[in-house]
Amino acid sequence: MPKPVIAIVGRPNVGKSTIFNRIVGERVSIVEDIPGVTRDRIYSAGEWLNHEFNIIDTGGIDIGDEPFLTQIRQQAEVAIDEADVIIFMTNGRDGVTAADEEVAKILYRSNKPVVLAVNKVDNPEMRSDIYDFYALGFGEPFPISGTHGLGLGDLLDEAAQHFPKIEEDGYDEDTIRFSLIGRPNVGKSSLVNALLGQERVIVSNVAGTTRDAVDTPYSKDGKDYVIIDTAGMRKKGKVYESTEKYSVLRALRAIERSDVVLVVLDGEEGIIEQDKKIAGYAHDSGRAVVIVVNKWDAVKKDEKTMKAFEENIRAHFQFLDYAPIVFLSAKTRKRTQTLIPVIDEVNESHSIRIQTNVLNDVIMDAVAMNPTPTHNGSRLKIFYATQVAVKPPTFVVFVNDPELLHFSYERFLKNRLRESFGFVGTPIHIIARARD
């Protein structure tokens, strides 16, 4: 189910990004050996006292040359739309400013829980200066120091008090939830309509637990599905409707509720950098992934075109080498019937569980084929492996020294697992652990 979302809002230069980095810590770093996988730090995961959440740094949203107050309003709009709790950041050294009051008016009308933080209170003597902030109307201000990390515990304690209770979505456990993500105008809505137009539709739109997404349940061949559609959302201001970062925010909320993610590309326009960013989030999520090339009817082609396009996808999306590719046209509905069987296949792969003895036979055969690496005279020894999770399949490999498992050898082991067990459309995680 979706994690609660905290948004950090405030005028420029109050330290929003510093607090964001303090809260997410090492989670901002992306450990990925394949070049070209770009990440946007606007949205990341955090954890506090067993509370997991996602956090938005609205300071990472670039409005361009809009007037100052317009920027603030639009920044707050993102927070109001996306967040369960808002941290309203101010600067204790500056006192209450007119811009702070402007933000306060917007947030006050939102009816969202707001926790007021006064940053840059770097020593106890400065605490006596924060009482003016009561005038903003959000109760007790929390003095913090982004530079030194002071006061963040109390701030997060208060934010966690406002997290919504986790509710089940009401669908059966066997129901496959899939979302369509992609930049604007790649044809997500058209594809949803094409899928629904072919099948018996259960006529009910259930409002999802994620704001701005509509769940559409339907059945095919006795199986139940839910399409989590991010394409039918109400229009935002023109500035945000055109910014790629806002598209990413919407996609992330849909991914979190999905079993399978369809990364939709525009076959006519080809691949651009934003496609790679959005696909990267699908990969990072650990969900099963299918790459869908839409508008294939509009592409001038011969017998080599599809193969060339597939090779181009593989070159750009090396990190999604496990994801199957489906070419179709939502407009003409050509090949759309091939999509659901692929969704079924990757969803099944996502839940594969391997018996421990069979798993270890494959691992030991792999080691015999390609001996483990050495580093500074020490050789990696693999004692045994076990599967600890599904969705995605996750394996713990017990070794003499986890530091000796180089990413290239880990990749080799993953490839051997795929050759042996399939794992079509699903990432595989391998965790090296020292044997006691």
From Swiss-Prot:
Any one Gene Ontology molecular-function term assigned to this protein's record: GTP binding
Keyword Repeat: yes
Gene3D superfamilies linked: 3.30.300.20, P-loop containing nucleotide triphosphate hydrolases (3.40.50.300)
Alphabetical UniProt keywords: GTP-binding, Nucleotide-binding, Repeat, Ribosome biogenesis
Disulphide bonds in the chain: none
Role played: GTPase that plays an essential role in the late steps of ribosome biogenesis.
Residue ranges that the Swiss-Prot or TrEMBL entry lists as coiled coil: none
GO biological process, one term: ribosome biogenesis
Residues covered by the EngA-type G domain: 4-167, 176-351
Domain KH-like per the UniProt entry, residue ranges: 352-436
Classification via InterPro entries: G_ENGA, GTP-bd, GTPase_Der, KH_dom-like, KH_dom-like_a/b, P-loop_NTPase, Small_GTP-bd
Designated name of the protein: GTPase Der
Family indicated by similarity: Belongs to the TRAFAC class TrmE-Era-EngA-EngB-Septin-like GTPase superfamily. EngA (Der) GTPase family.
UniProt: GTP 1 binding residues: 10-17, 57-61, 119-122
SUPFAM superfamilies in alphabetical order: P-loop containing nucleoside triphosphate hydrolases
Residues at which GTP 2 binds: 182-189, 229-233, 294-297
Keyword hit for Transport: no
Source organism per UniProt: Bacillus cereus (strain ATCC 10987 / NRS 248)
Gene behind this protein: der
PROSITE patterns: G_ENGA (PS51712)
Subunit structure: Associates with the 50S ribosomal subunit.
